[in-house]
Amino acid sequence: MIHKTQKFNMKSERRAYREIYAFYFFCLFLKKVIKKLLTFCYWIRNIIFNKFEIWLRKRVFYMGIEYREERSGSKIQIFSYCDEKKTGAICALSDGYDWALICDVWADKAETEKKLIREMILKLQGQEIFVTATPDKLDLYEEIGFRRSKNSFTYVGKVLSDAQEKELTESGLYLPIGYRYETEFEPLTGMFPVGKKSDKQKFKVFYSDKSDRADYHQVNALLEKAFGGKRNEYVTKDTFSKSQYVQYAYDNETLIGCARAISDGAHALILNVAVDPDYQGLHLGWNIVDKLSRQMKDQNIFLNTHPGGVGFYNQKGFRRNKTALLLPAHEMPDEIKKGFCLPRGYRFSDESLKVQKTP
């Protein structure tokens, strides 16, 4: 016979077990609810943070800038938009391999302008990039990494009056005819080719601006002979065939000179001006460049040369650029840099900023 006290204890024990089991299952249920609630909160958090991050990137980091790119032939354009409103644009010419020229930059804010230039530099990575800036933009480009170019020229193509010459010089964009930097009087180590006058007397030159008769194997061989080193024949063919303007010089069927230019109809960049060393000193180079430039009537024509070619262009027909800048594709050795670039921070005495001639 079970005592009443024992019965009571057994009932209490069963009740306690039931309560423990109920609490255990309640905890399992609560755990699932909390887990689902946390998952839901994490999902909401991700949505909020992702949208906030997009908003933050636009409003704080990128100032709402969206870039849109357009390409046509040798021309590359990048437009910046903020809330579908155009805030800036930059245009450049590029041959797709080695050379590029930034032509125009417009932006509603200085920061947007800088970002546009950097965006274009990314598109032109691996190429030598030139730009002709106004004097007030020199600091901007030097901050980005450009160096003032010593060997850049703009084609004028006609004899100017004294008043026109003065106006051109006073614009602050060009140097006087025949201007030489003080460092150009220093002897170089012979790494820049300067052609010797040929002793050829009997030859007949034929000029052509047609690509259909061009033998690109001859073009590649001529560039190697004129500038040294080995060149990729495929790249030579691709760049010359896609250039908007070309000029060739032949002695009978032998190619003895060439040049090409990329253009968007308003701006042009002359490239690969070469004359067979056996024919140098006979004005072939000048005739090739002049004939090529005359094809691009009323265009702003830019070219850059090596230090040995400065004297060739530093005369009537061309004007030496005062505010041209270069962003090299690769770091230059100091001796070569001295021939192509001015020291960082260099300013002429008539420029508003303080003259600094230390690198």
Where do the language-model regions lie?
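Conserved acetyl-CoA pyrophosphate-binding loop and the N-cap/start of the following alpha-helix
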Residues: 109-120, 278-288
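A conserved beta-strand-loop-helix scaffold within acyl/acetyltransferase catalytic domains
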Residues: 73-106, 231-274
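Conserved acetyl-CoA-binding loop of GNAT-fold acetyltransferases
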Residues: 143-151, 316-323
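Conserved GNAT acetyl-CoA-binding A-motif
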Residues: 124-135, 294-307
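Acidic/histidine-enriched, beta-strand-rich ligand/metal-binding domains
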Residues: 103-104, 140, 271-272, 278-281, ...
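Short hydrophobic alpha-helical segments enriched in small aliphatic residues
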Residues: 4, 10-13, 22
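Short amphipathic alpha-helix that is part of the acyltransferase structural core
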Residues: 50-81, 152, 164-234, 324, ...
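Short, positively charged and aromatic/hydrophobic N-terminal segments
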Residues: 29, 35, 39-42, 46-53
